Amino acid sequence: MQKTSIVAFRRGYRLQWEAAQESHVILYPEGMAKLNETAAAILELVDGRRDVAAIIAMLNERFPEAGGVDDDVVEFLQIACQQKWITCREPE
């Protein structure tokens, strides 16, 4: 995954707030995965148009006290891709 990679939810997967879980979850055909606040903040920005660099920039602006989230965001998005929650493609 590169910072120029564009990430999107896979077909059948979606992020939503689950009141019963009191957290955001990824819903998918086989079940769901409960997310922590950090994971939810990252995935809320995944829209199929933004690249990884744009997501990082938005999070750095939103959470300046974090002191730079670049590596953490890339690592999490790689895990989300390995879990098959999202897809990753290079721009055309």
UniProtKB/Swiss-Prot annotation:
Keyword annotations of the record: PQQ biosynthesis
Organism this protein belongs to: Klebsiella pneumoniae (strain 342)
NCBIfam families cross-referenced by the UniProt entry: PQQ_PqqD, PRK02079.1
Pfam families the record matches: PqqD
HAMAP family: PQQ_syn_PqqD
Subunit structure comment from the entry: Monomer. Interacts with PqqE.
Pathway involvement of the protein, from the record: Cofactor biosynthesis; pyrroloquinoline quinone biosynthesis
Gene Ontology molecular function, alphabetical: quinone binding
Superkingdom, natural source: Bacteria
Function noted in UniProt: Functions as a PqqA binding protein and presents PqqA to PqqE, in the pyrroloquinoline quinone (PQQ) biosynthetic pathway.
Keyword Lipid biosynthesis set for record: no
Entry protein name: PqqA binding protein
InterPro entries on file: PQQD, PqqD_bac, PqqD_sf
Keyword Nucleotide-binding: no
One GO BP annotation of this record: pyrroloquinoline quinone biosynthetic process
Similarity remark: Belongs to the PqqD family.
Coiled-coil zones: none
